[in-house]
């Protein structure tokens, strides 16, 4: 890979402790060069956190804007997006910002997983959540002993819920998964909206069931996987200064596989489907011909038997 230091490696260097339970403050120099203490509003903290998340989400994707009219259209778009992201995880070994909606222990859950790393040799998935704080870190506390117990438990719970959600996506029965992704679409065997087909550059005959079959094929890679979890604790001040001064690169090489891969996969699956249908027809005709031949032989034997009795 062409990057100087991966996001995971970079943020592992910053793992530390959330130690301040009071008002978040930031030190900055005023116009005269004097250091002053400023209180940050919740909006400022959130805006900077969003910026850091966007920096960490540096895998380039070819996003396609698609207008939709109905809930069924939205379900199709989400299904197509999930297929593309799972393929990127499979091929590139990592994916960012995976939207996920699953059923865990009878409860419907939604979330966006910040980063997932796939090690195909070990069949291991690392689920990562980015936590950005505007507070200096103590870098010699890898076990996070200084973090309040409630924070540690909350973060741990969140990550383990993400693991449960991801595992459900990979292991749920096809019927349960179908119900989650396209259950409310009235006719799953009718072609999807032509505008969606045009945007994705796929045949206008593609159906919701065709897309769902591709999802099943793509998720079949992730069977019997082991899970690990990681929280990326990022000090906002330190991260921004490192990023802006170029001390550490956090930019991955480009990955633009979504639309091109999706188009090829759909065409391949349709061709495979047609081939299987053709083979099924051939086998069906052969079986019918065999039955006709057997019936003909039985009739001939019955005639011979009747003549012998006379």
Curated annotation (Swiss-Prot):
Residues 269-307 form a coiled coil. GO terms for molecular function: single-stranded DNA 5'-3' DNA exonuclease activity. Keywords: Coiled coil. One of its GO terms (biological process) is interstrand cross-link repair. Residues 290-310 are annotated as: Disordered. Pfam families: Exo5 (PF09810). Residues 290-304 have a biased composition (Basic and acidic residues). Signal peptide: none annotated. This is Uncharacterized protein ORF95. It comes from Ostreid herpesvirus 1 (isolate France) (OsHV-1).
């Amino acid at each position: 890979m062409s990057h100087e230091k991966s996001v995971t490696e970079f943020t592992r260097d910053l793992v530390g402790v959330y130690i301040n339970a009071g008002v978040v403050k930031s030190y900055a120099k005023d116009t005269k060069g004097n250091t002053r203490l400023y209180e940050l509003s919740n909006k400022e903290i959130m805006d900077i956190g969003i910026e850091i998340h966007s920096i960490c989400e540096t895998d380039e994707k070819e996003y396609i804007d698609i207008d939709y009219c109905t809930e069924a259209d939205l379900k199709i778009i989400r299904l197509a997006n999930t297929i593309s992201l799972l393929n990127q995880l499979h091929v590139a070994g990592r994916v960012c910002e995976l939207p996920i909606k699953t059923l865990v222990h009878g409860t419907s859950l939604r979330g966006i997983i910040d980063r997932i790393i796939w090690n195909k040799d070990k069949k291991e998935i690392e689920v990562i959540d980015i936590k950005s704080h505007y507070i200096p870190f103590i870098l010699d506390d890898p076990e996070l002993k200084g973090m309040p117990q409630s924070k540690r438990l909350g973060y741990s719970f969140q990550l383990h819920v993400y693991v449960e959600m991801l595992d459900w996506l990979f292991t749920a029965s096809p019927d349960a998964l179908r119900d989650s992704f396209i259950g409310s679409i009235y006719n799953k065997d009718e072609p999807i909206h032509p505008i969606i087909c045009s945007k994705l550059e796929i045949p206008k005959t593609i159906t919701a069931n065709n897309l769902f079959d591709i999802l099943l094929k793509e998720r079949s890679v992730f069977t019997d996987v082991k899970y690990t979890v990681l929280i990326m604790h990022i000090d906002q001040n330190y991260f921004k200064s490192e990023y802006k001064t170029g001390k550490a690169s956090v930019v991955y090489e480009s990955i633009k596989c979504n639309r091109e891969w999706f188009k090829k996969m759909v065409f391949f699956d349709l061709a495979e489907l047609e081939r299987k249908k053709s083979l099924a027809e051939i086998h069906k005709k052969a079986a019918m011909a065999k039955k006709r031949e057997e019936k003909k032989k039985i009739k001939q034997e019955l005639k011979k038997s009747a003549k012998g009795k006379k």
